[in-house]
Amino acid sequence: MSIEEWDAVIKVHLRGTFATTHHAANYWRDRSKAGDPVDARIVNTSSSSGIYGNVGQSNYGAAKAGIAAFTVITAMELARYGVTVNAIAPAALTRMTEDLVRWQSDGEDAPAWDPRDPGNIAPLVAWLGSVESRDITGRVFNVRGGLVSVAEGWVAGPAEDKGARWEPGELGEVIPRLVAGARANSDTSGRTPTA
């Protein structure tokens, strides 16, 4: 991957998300400061590639991970103005992904309800954009077919506090123990492998 390819994907996804949020946030902030009531929503689009990883998509995954983090942070920043900010990480079959997965018929007709249909994503976006969702902010939601789940993001795991600066040689004993006590990283669909 070239630097230009990296920059192009980051610019479209991460900068594009920032640009629209920037202008909307300025508008709502000005309205709020003028004393007008604001009850607004932002719904960003992340990806499972950004929150769980996917081999061969480091530029896309980094951009989408940035959008997930941007969502959490802007939710904190815009709450005082009456704006909620959430993101979806959709999985659907689109023109861009149709060559990756094709219906394997084996003589069968395609199912009447296709869990890969992009239309399955719309109800969550509509709900997140509604008044009913006003108490939900700073969340990233996985949505695939009929499945909706909350991506729980980074959390602090096992720790050891020496109370002083560590020496590199001391960490050779500590880090493997901390990693052994931590949850395993999830697979590309967000599931944590079981032992």
Q: Where are these predicted regions, by residue range?
A:
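Active-site helix of classical SDR
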Residues: 21, 63
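Substrate-binding pocket helix/loop in short-chain dehydrogenase/reductase
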Residues: 2-7
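A short helix-coil junction within the Rossmann-fold of NAD(P)-dependent oxidoreductases
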Residues: 23-38
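Residue(s) in the substrate-gating loop at a strand-loop-helix junction
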Residues: 47
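Active-site loop-to-helix junction immediately N-terminal to the catalytic Tyr of the SDR YXXXK motif
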Residues: 1, 53-61, 73
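C-terminal helical subdomain
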Residues: 87, 108-195
